[in-house]
Regions:
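Long, charge-rich alpha-helical interaction segments
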Residues: 248-297
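Short acidic (Asp/Glu) and glycine-rich catalytic loops that position anionic groups and cofactors
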Residues: 36, 226, 251-259, 336-338, ...
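Long, charge-rich, low-complexity alpha-helical segments
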Residues: 3, 12, 23, 33-35, ...
Length: 400
């Protein structure tokens, strides 16, 4: 897993953006991940974040998609607050600001889901991704009233709530349905699995706090009648159902699975053989590793663009002070002599495992520090290797 440090730090344009986790990633995974909530008090600095920052995130969101919402008791119809127009032959969409402002004054919550290409949001999300070893998706919530955006519900993903402006009261209840999947929304199951009556937690999340909530835990974040803005970073691992679906897609390779069905007595023997084939495939280590390789290979990490270094033919190497990290959420395969980053599988010899291992254990390590750790290596070749792996989007620069 990446990011074993208690404090993960990222810098851009001289502004420090960091999340201070009060547990290591290994302890978090063992004691908290998918098990119980965890509150990180004063985990982020909010000095560099303002309503101007929040406005810019909303302005750059695609308001026409279903990922952008305005909620007041229910999700409002798009036509109520978005207009379409032709801009020199291009269909565009924009917020009808007077209407949006009016809804916000009445207590509505503005929601932007699946945020991409926002540097500050991306840096927080990347730290959480490295801390958990999982894919992440980021959302933003802005409100000014005292009404909740949704009634008490559970999420089908683990979430890190990062409070950046103002406060929110969180009322949290233990799960009534354990580990719900994305098809098992609380609104469809609340009668069968009702919310407990006694809260597990009732607290105020303040600016700078980060709150981790596992999937399935009932919660109701309540605005307190004051301006509030928070990010929600959801984490997405491979689930057992994903593996089962993958296994079933392999079954047509077996002749028994391709047979037609007749009466029960005629089909029973063949179905028993199918069950044996399925069990053998499902429990084979080779199947599991192949699935995980495919899952990780399909994952993409948005690395920072560095045209002035990798696009300039006169630049032969990344700067010595540049920070280096792996373009992956997890160091999957490293102990077996390979890593997968942005769809590229990189086979490693013993020295390569040590090199990538150093980067994995210390994301953001400088090129100069890497060179110093391998005094017997050919410095010129090492610099060239690191530069080429950055150019191939296997590694990326973090601070240069």
């Amino acid at each position: 897993m990446l990011g074993s440090e208690v404090c993960a730090v990222s810098r851009c344009l001289g502004v420090s953006v960091s999340i201070v986790f009060n547990v290591s990633s290994s302890e978090f995974c063992a004691k908290y991940q998918e098990k119980q909530p965890l509150l990180f008090k004063k985990a982020v600095s909010t000095e560099s974040f303002s309503w101007r920052s929040a406005n810019e995130i909303i302005e750059r969101s695609n308001v026409a998609t279903s990922d952008f919402k305005l909620s007041l008791g229910k999700v409002l119809e798009k036509h109520e607050y978005i207009e379409s127009y032709i801009d020199i032959g291009t269909l565009r969409h924009r917020l009808i600001k007077p209407i949006v402002y009016d809804y916000l004054r009445k207590g509505a919550t503005l929601i932007a889901n699946k945020i991409r290409n926002e540097s500050m949001v991306g840096r927080y999300a990347r730290q959480i991704s490295e801390f958990t070893g999982r894919q992440v998706v980021s959302s933003a919530y802005a409100a000014f009233g005292s009404k909740d955006s949704f009634r008490c519900h559970w999420d089908t993903r683990d979430v890190f709530a990062i409070q950046l402006i103002g406060r929110k009261r969180w009322i949290v209840y233990e799960p009534s349905m354990v580990s719900p999947l994305y098809t098992q929304q609380s609104k469809d199951y609340e009668k069968q699995y009702p919310c407990p009556s006694t809260p597990y937690m009732d607290f105020v999340l303040e600016a700078g706090d980060v709150f981790y909530l596992p999937r399935g835990w009932w919660h109701n974040p309540l605005p307190l009648g004051e301006p509030t803005f928070h990010l929600a970073v959801g984490t997405f691992p491979a689930f057992t159902m994903d593996y089962l679906n993958w296994v079933f897609r392999q079954m047509p390779e077996f002749v028994e699975a391709r047979q037609s069905l007749g009466d029960w007595e005629g089909s029973r023997k063949n179905l028993a053989m199918v069950a044996q084939r399925l069990n053998d495939l499902l429990t084979a280590p080779e199947s599991y590793h192949r699935f995980m390789n495919e899952f990780v290979s399909a994952t993409r990490v948005e690395s920072a663009l560095a045209m002035e270094i990798f696009g300039d033919p006169s630049i032969g190497s990344v700067p010595d002070h540049a920070g280096i990290r792996l373009c992956a959420n997890t160091s999957h395969g490293l102990s077996d002599g390979y890593v997968i980053a942005n769809g590229t599988k990189l086979n490693l010899d013993k020295e390569g495992m040590l090199l990538i291992g150093s980067i994995v254990r210390q994301p953001g390590i400088s090129l100069a520090s890497l060179v110093a750790r391998f005094p017997d290596a050919d410095v010129s070749k090492l610099r060239h290797l690191i530069t080429e792996l950055c150019r191939q989007d296997v590694l990326e620069l973090t601070d240069y």
